[in-house]
């Protein structure tokens, strides 16, 4: 494993509401309305299925919307994405809202749990999003995308296995990770050879965004 672990100064950005989020991202009024509608749907469906921790819903704009949207700053020209373990629509639905109307934009939402796919379809239909929902395991699909991403999906050692087919087909990986990322990368390095680069999260001072390239299996997980 080759990793850039140098500490970096993070500008703390805390969009506590929709207008603050709009100032940070430059999103349109229509996109802001879609994100607000998504917030309502996420809150409604979360009452009957475990999509996100209930305690995180009051901080939706920072914890979920901005946490997801910051990926577009890392890959501003990417139009095709695959979100692995996309059950709550994070980051995939947020990306789809912000890319809606962009020529060639397509977000693949990959989720193995049927009931969560039902939620994703309800959101996609309500907001008319440029998404394709795959009720399947990530490693079973034959998708060619520019970026593969995931949030709260699996430890890095398993996540790399899910992402490997996408990387083989030319994708770059950007994974949203928390404060345990260093230990996750160390564990993953016993099974995989890869290059990684860490970027500080703009939504959480404890979080990191991990870029992965050059992935090769060393031994079976």
Swiss-Prot record:
| SUPFAM superfamilies for the chain | S-adenosyl-L-methionine-dependent methyltransferases (SSF53335)
What EC number(s) are associated with this protein in UniProt?
Answer: 2.1.1.170
Location of the protein in the cell: Cytoplasm
Q: Keywords of this protein's UniProt record, alphabetized?
A: Cytoplasm, Methyltransferase, rRNA processing, S-adenosyl-L-methionine, Transferase
Query: Record's Gene3D superfamilies?
Result: Vaccinia Virus protein VP39
Q: Which GO terms describe its molecular function?
A: rRNA (guanine-N7-)-methyltransferase activity
Q: Where is the signal peptide?
A: none
Cross-referenced Pfam families, in alphabetical order? GidB
Name the positions where S-adenosyl-L-methionine binds.
Answer: 85, 90, 138-139, 151
HAMAP family on file? 16SrRNA_methyltr_G
Q: Indicate the family of this protein.
A: Belongs to the methyltransferase superfamily. RNA methyltransferase RsmG family.
What does this protein do, in the record's words? Specifically methylates the N7 position of guanine in position 527 of 16S rRNA.
**Protein name, entry field:** Ribosomal RNA small subunit methyltransferase G
**Organism encoding this protein:** Caulobacter sp. (strain K31)
- State the organism's lineage: Bacteria, Pseudomonadati, Pseudomonadota, Alphaproteobacteria, Caulobacterales
